[in-house]
Amino acid sequence: WRKAFKLCPPTASQNMLLNGMTLIGKEIVKTKDAQVRAAMIDTVLTLNDLRAEYYPKYAVTAYNSKGQYITQYFKDPQVVYDQLNKIIEINQEKVKPSLLLLDLNAAIELYKKSAIGAEDVINTYQNAIALLDKAGNSDDNAKIRSDIEGLFITSQVASCDNLIALFTPRYEADPDNMDLVTNIVKMLGSTEGCQNNDLFLNAVTKMHKNEPSASSAYYLYKLHSAKDESETAIKYFEEAVS
């Protein structure tokens, strides 16, 4: 195979690239020499890049394959995070769903080491969920989504303080951005003990003004009641029952 790969251009045969991945993959398992192993891993990743470049019809598959090799061969969360982010950026909603989960896991590991901030982890999580939404419903996507949400919640990165610190300047800069407002309500609303703050109240109020409903009016009544703002609470209660 090595002779054929050396003599023939990548366009000679896609199977030549695929066979190379298989053969070298077996050799990687056997070798004990760290330097040789690193070179072999680099070759496998390069073969995936060549497949994506010269056989664009299979580019998505090639990059997803590369992502799997990266998570298989690299244990450094920084390498995994950086490399998977590149693949996710290219493949978007066509990325293999499990890579989104592994990318978030790497982000959380880096956060624990103070290598990245909470905002980076939250952005990684939100991007993963957005891509799964675009990809559509499937059993695989639903399971991965559940795993991603579970991992994110148990990581405790999305503390109320972190969310408020992240979203307050965004809201102040663009208070009429309904996508942002909806996101704030969703994120803070699903975080335990994160509904009794001005950011959440302002976002819910903005959503209600944009799309008034009896349920949102009643929710605002409850929020203002909790803050002992009786006059405003009564106003929303009357709106809810009218």
What are these model-predicted stretches?
Residues 2-219, 223-227:
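Preference for long, solvent-exposed alpha-helical segments and helix-linker "stalks"
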Residues 223, 232-239:
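Charge-dense, extended regions
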